[in-house]
C-alpha cells in the first residue's frame, strides 16, 4: 500500500508519539552510559509500507453500539488495514467466530458473528484491489465492569473471557496474561489517576512507582496508551510516560506507546490510530511490531493540561519516510 503525503522530515512534534523519542531524557541523567536502541532499525524504508490500525475496538458484544459486522465494515470502509476487536470480557477468536457475551454487561444483546463470506472479502480485500484488513485475533479488554476503569487490553491471549475485574488493579490482569503467554497494554491510565483533572498526579511518586513496577516485572506488558479517543482523559498521560521512561529504561526495557479510538459508536471511529511499518500486512508481522515498536502512535486530537485550547487536526497525518 502506497500512501500519499509522506514527509521526509523529523520534527519534535512528530517524534512525540514515536516509541523511542524520550530515551534522550534518560540519557541526560548523571554520568551513566546508555545504549539508545532505535526500534526502526529493522525497517527497510524503500520497500516496507505503512498500514493503518486500530487496536482498541468495541461492539454489541460488550458496551459498543454497533454489531461486530457493522463495526468491522466501518473501519474497512475508512481504509484501515489492521483491526483488533477488544470487547470487555470477551475474547475475539475471529470476527466470523461465535463469542460468549456476559449477560447484563452487554444488555443481553445478541452478538452475531460476521458471515464467512464477508470475512473472506474483507481479509483478502477482494473488493479493495486486494488490500485486505487483517483480523488481530485473541484480543480482549480485561478488568470488566470496574468503576475505576483500570482497563487492560490483552492480545494473543486465551485469558480473560468472562473474568470480572478488580477495582484499582492493573497488575492482576497483566500477570495473568503473562502466564498465558500473551501481551498486554495499559489503557487510558489517566482515567484511574484522574490526571486530566489533577495533572500534577502524573509526576507523583505513588503513580510512577505503581506503573513502573508493572513494566519492570512484566516484559509482556508492552506499553500504554498515551492517547485514547479525543485525548480527554489521557491529556496528562504523556507526562506520566516520560516519568516512567526515566525509571524503567535504566532497567533495560522500553515502554512502547499506543493511540487508539476505544470505539463504541460511529462517531468514535478515526480519531486515534497507529501506523505500522511492515514488509507485509500479516498478523505475525503486527505481533512482532507491537513488541519492537516499529510503528507510530497518531491522533487527530491533542488536549493540554494548562487550559490552552486543544488541537483537532484535519486531513491525513504526516508520515515519516526515513530515520537516519
Report the location of each language-model feature.
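Structural recognition of alpha->loop->beta junctions
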Residues: 202-232, 278-285
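A metal-dependent hydrolase metal-coordination microenvironment
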Residues: 32-198, 225-241, 260-263
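C-terminal functional module detector
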Residues: 29-33, 37-45, 71, 248-256, ...
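Short low-complexity, flexible loop/linker segments enriched in glycine and/or proline
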Residues: 97-102, 199-204, 208, 272-274
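Histidine/acidic residue-rich metal-binding segments in metalloenzymes
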Residues: 168-180, 206-219, 235-252
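Short loop/turn motifs at secondary-structure junctions
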Residues: 2, 79, 219-220
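Sec-dependent N-terminal signal peptides
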Residues: 4-19
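Sec-dependent signal peptide cleavage junction
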Residues: 17-32
Amino acid at each position: 500500500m502506497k500512501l500519499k503525503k509522506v514527509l521526509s522530515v523529523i520534527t519534535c512534534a512528530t517524534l512525540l508519539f514515536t516509541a523511542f523519542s524520550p530515551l534522550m531524557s534518560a540519557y541526560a541523567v548523571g554520568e551513566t552510559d546508555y545504549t539508545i536502541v532505535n526500534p526502526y532499525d529493522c525497517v527497510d524504508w524503500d520497500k516496507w509500507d505503512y498500514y493503518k490500525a486500530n487496536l482498541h475496538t468495541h461492539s454489541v458484544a460488550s458496551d459498543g453500539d454497533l454489531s461486530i459486522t457493522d463495526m468491522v465494515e466501518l473501519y474497512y470502509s475508512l481504509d484501515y488495514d489492521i483491526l483488533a476487536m477488544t470487547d470487555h470480557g470477551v475474547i475475539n477468536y475471529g470476527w466470523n467466530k461465535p463469542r460468549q457475551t456476559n449477560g447484563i454487561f452487554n444488555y443481553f444483546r445478541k452478538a452475531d458473528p460476521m458471515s464467512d463470506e464477508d470475512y473472506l472479502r474483507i481479509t483478502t480485500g477482494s473488493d479493495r484491489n486486494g488490500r485486505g484488513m487483517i483480523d488481530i485475533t485473541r484480543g480482549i479488554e480485561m478488568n470488566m465492569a470496574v468503576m475505576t476503569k483500570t482497563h487492560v487490553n490483552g492480545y494473543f491471549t486465551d485469558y480473560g473471557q468472562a473474568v470480572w475485574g478488580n477495582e484499582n488493579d492493573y497488575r492482576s490482569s497483566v500477570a495473568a496474561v503473562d502466564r498465558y503467554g500473551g501481551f498486554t497494554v495499559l489503557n487510558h491510565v489517566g482515567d484511574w489517576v484522574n490526571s486530566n483533572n489533577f495533572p500534577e498526579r502524573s509526576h507523583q511518586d505513588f503513580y510512577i512507582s505503581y506503573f513502573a513496577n508493572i513494566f519492570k516485572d512484566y516484559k509482556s506488558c508492552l506499553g500504554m496508551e498515551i492517547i485514547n479517543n479525543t485525548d480527554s482523559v489521557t491529556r496528562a498521560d504523556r507526562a506520566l510516560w516520560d516519568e516512567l521512561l526515566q525509571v524503567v529504561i535504566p532497567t533495560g526495557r522500553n515502554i512502547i506507546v499506543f493511540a487508539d479510538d476505544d470505539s463504541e459508536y460511529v462517531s468514535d471511529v478515526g480519531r486515534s490510530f497507529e501506523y505500522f511499518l511492515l514488509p507485509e500486512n500479516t498478523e505475525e508481522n503486527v505481533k512482532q511490531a507491537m513488541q519492537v515498536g516499529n510503528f507510530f502512535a497518531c491522533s487527530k486530537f491533542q488536549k493540554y493540561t494548562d487550559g490552552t485550547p486543544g488541537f483537532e487536526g484535519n486531513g491525513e497525518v504526516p508520515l515519516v519516510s526515513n530515520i537516519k
